[in-house]
């Protein structure tokens, strides 16, 4: 079982325990202890389908962005696959910056600079529509 699945399972167990033990001291999952101290955006990235990362979204406070390779057989190398499905380092940076823009931490101009710097084509067809 991968770490993501263990994190989700443990968070579900804690949630269940808290529901059926309302008068006892409520437990906190590892995800909550690790990520919920501050309400900051989380960007979860996987070479698997986006839904794999989305499994932990309900247990993370703050905005949550999942990137994943929702398909296969589209590229000859892992690098090309990540670029095609928009999960390479450039899209990760852009997603993180955009999350900070949405939080009001940085200005939209920073996202525009990232798009320009990394030659991200905003007219590129969405990978899930191809």
Where are these regions (language model features)?
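Thiamine diphosphate
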Residues: 4-130
């Amino acid at each position: 079982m991968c770490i993501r699945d263990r994190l989700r399972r443990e968070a579900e167990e804690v949630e269940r325990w808290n529901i059926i033990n309302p008068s006892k001291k409520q437990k906190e999952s590892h995800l909550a202890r690790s990520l919920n101290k501050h309400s900051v955006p989380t960007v979860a990235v996987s070479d698997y389908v986006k839904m794999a990362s989305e499994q932990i979204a309900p247990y993370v406070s703050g905005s949550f962005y999942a990137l994943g390779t929702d398909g296969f057989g589209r590229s000859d190398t892992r690098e090309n696959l990540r670029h095609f499905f928009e999960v390479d380092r450039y899209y990760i940076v852009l997603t993180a910056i955009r999350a900070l823009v949405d939080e009001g931490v940085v200005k939209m101009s920073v996202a525009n600079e990232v798009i320009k710097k990394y030659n991200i084509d905003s007219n590129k067809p969405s990978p899930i529509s191809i």
